[in-house]
């Protein structure tokens, strides 16, 4: 009997997302329920954004939650390497195989040519897609241009008519017309594969039997299915899980909710409660009980109990469930967990240099730096009053700073400072106009340690969470303001 093998394959391009944890949990439970194996693979072909720091954060976040893997980049295994960036020769081999079989072809179109092609298609009211012009080139011309080293990508051929039947474990057969599919790029000009080629090759070579992924991938499933057909490989069972959503039913995003697993760890949530809550996202125990452990979920797991309605990720409900777990702890364990959470030596070493020179007794540390150990802060609204700025201007400035910080890739003091500086200059203000507001929002106080140092230490999710809290305290942002201010955002360098 074939061993069930599932996997999670996150990209190390930022903080570990709760959506990644959610999909990892369901893959883990499915594998363990069937006596199988759960694999961790790192999809790091985006060399500009992928970092080893983000990769380590993924490892740490999953292990904090209690989700472990039998094979992966850090533990090895018989199917490695487990980083896509280390599998380049493998992808080149299989991509060339597709070209040799006539299922893929070189495309020499420049970005400008592709832009013009799409613009013309849109002007005609057509769906923009690659028109296959490279297929009209003669073999001789293709060979000549390849020999000359002309930049090119490799695209896959797709049918122009008919439908692809996607067998989904949750929905049954889903029919998707082929005319919605583009001739997908499989290999980029830099020789690195795109998601589609790498995903299929890796899943096959690693013996993955079942793929549970987010439903946002369902529309592009025909491309993956076609690649399996081209290679002549057996396709894994497919399951497209419902997406996590904000309370307003929109797709879960960091603009409306903290989405980093690290944020919830820093906020003092229990990993057991976090897993419990993620397990209730579209799934329920046979007896409908709300509180259950990871092992209980594994023991009772059945995909038939997954609901397709968009599960709502609500921090208030998560907090309530976490409270249930906290209150059920023996008091000795509760005290031990509080101590472990609050007095993390690595975190304390980041804070200590900024506090030591400002206090005369240890008792002064908590009033000065207690905000480092809190989730949110409760600043007085009077702290946001400005002699130079109106209330509306204060909200606008803080909202623009929040938006710019959301797109910041490197969370370091210099880049944080440069981001705030860019916003204030775009509004023809000075940095000193913004800093008292940032002190109030981030520390809850009029003054403390350097707020820029504090933001770096607190991290992106906790910083953005407090900025959102401050903006809400001042009345929030209307839909009209949101639309107007987003136009300003686009003009900020």
Swiss-Prot record:
Name of the protein described by the UniProt record: Glutamate--tRNA ligase
One example of a Gene Ontology biological process annotation: glutamyl-tRNA aminoacylation
Pfam families: Anticodon_2, tRNA-synt_1c
Record motif 'HIGH' region, residues: 10-20
Disulfide-bonded cysteines: none
Function (record text): Catalyzes the attachment of glutamate to tRNA(Glu) in a two-step reaction: glutamate is first activated by ATP to form Glu-AMP and then transferred to the acceptor end of tRNA(Glu).
UniProt entry keywords in alphabetical sequence: Aminoacyl-tRNA synthetase, ATP-binding, Cytoplasm, Ligase, Nucleotide-binding, Protein biosynthesis
InterPro entries: aa-tRNA-synth_I_cd-bd (IPR045462), aa-tRNA-synth_I_codon-bd_sub2 (IPR020751), aa-tRNA-synth_I_CS (IPR001412), aa_tRNA-synth_I_cd-bd_sf (IPR008925), Glu-tRNA-ligase_bac/mito (IPR004527), Glu/Gln-tRNA-synth (IPR000924), Glu/Gln-tRNA-synth_Ib_cat-dom (IPR020058), GluQ/Sye (IPR049940)
Catalysed reactions, semicolon-separated: tRNA(Glu) + L-glutamate + ATP = L-glutamyl-tRNA(Glu) + AMP + diphosphate
Stated family: Belongs to the class-I aminoacyl-tRNA synthetase family. Glutamate--tRNA ligase type 1 subfamily.
UniProt-annotated binding residues for ATP: 254
Motif ('KMSKS' region): 251-255
Principal EC category: ligase
EC nos: 6.1.1.17
Name of the encoding gene: gltX
Recorded GO CC terms: cytosol
GO MF, one example: glutamate-tRNA ligase activity
Cellular location(s): Cytoplasm
């Amino acid at each position: 009997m074939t061993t069930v093998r599932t996997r999670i394959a996150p990209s190390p391009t930022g903080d570990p997302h709760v959506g990644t944890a959610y999909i990892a949990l369901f893959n883990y439970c499915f594998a363990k329920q069937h006596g199988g194996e759960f694999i961790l693979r790192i999809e790091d072909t985006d060399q500009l954004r992928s970092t080893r720091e983000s990769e380590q954060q993924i490892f740490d976040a999953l292990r904090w939650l209690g989700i472990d893997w039998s094979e992966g980049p850090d533990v090895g295994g018989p199917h490695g390497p487990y980083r896509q960036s280390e599998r380049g020769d493998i992808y080149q081999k299989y991509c060339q195989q597709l070209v040799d079989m006539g299922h893929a072809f070189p495309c020499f179109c420049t970005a400008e040519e592709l832009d013009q092609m799409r613009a013309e298609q849109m002007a005609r009211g057509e769906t923009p897609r690659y028109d296959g012009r490279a297929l009209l080139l003669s073999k001789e011309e293709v060979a000549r241009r390849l020999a000359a080293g002309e930049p090119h990508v490799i695209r896959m051929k797709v049918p122009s008519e008919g439908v692809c039947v996607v067998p989904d474990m949750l929905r049954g057969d889903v029919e998707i017309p082929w005319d919605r599919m583009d001739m997908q790029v499989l290999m980029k000009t830099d020789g690195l594969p795109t998601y589609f080629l790498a995903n299929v090759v890796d899943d096959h070579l690693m013996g993955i039997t079942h793929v549970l992924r987010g439903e946002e991938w369902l529309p592009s499933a025909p491309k993956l299915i076609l690649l399996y057909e081209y290679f002549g490989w057996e396709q894994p069972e497919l399951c497209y899980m419902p997406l996590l959503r904000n309370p307003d039913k929109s797709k879960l995003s960091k603009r409306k909710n903290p989405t980093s697993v690290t944020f919830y760890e820093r906020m003092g949530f229990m990993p057991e409660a976090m897993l419990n809550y993620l397990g209730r996202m579209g799934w329920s125990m046979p007896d409908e009980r709300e509180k259950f452990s990871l092992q209980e979920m594994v023991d009772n797991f059945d995909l038939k109990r997954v609901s397709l309605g968009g599960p709502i990720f609500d921090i208030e409900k998560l907090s309530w469930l976490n409270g249930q777990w906290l209150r059920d702890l023996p008091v000795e364990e509760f005290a031990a967990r509080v101590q472990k959470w609050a007095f993390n030596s690595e975190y304390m070493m980041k804070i200590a240099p900024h506090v030591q020179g400002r206090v005369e007794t240890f008792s002064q540390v908590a009033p000065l730096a207690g905000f480092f150990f809190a989730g949110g802060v409760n600043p007085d609204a009077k702290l946001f009053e400005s002699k130079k700025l109106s209330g509306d201007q204060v909200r606008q400035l803080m909202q623009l700073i929040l938006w710019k910080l959301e797109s910041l890739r490197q969370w370091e003091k210099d880049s944080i400072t440069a981001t705030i500086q860019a916003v204030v200059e775009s509004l023809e203000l000075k940095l000193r106009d913004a800093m008292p507001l940032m002190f109030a929002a981030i520390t809850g106080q009029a003054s403390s340690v350097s707020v820029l140092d504090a933001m770096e230490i607190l991290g992106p999710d906790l910083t953005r969470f407090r900025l959102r809290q401050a903006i809400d305290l001042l009345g929030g942002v209307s839909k009209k303001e949101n639309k107007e201010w987003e136009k300003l955002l686009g003009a900020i360098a």
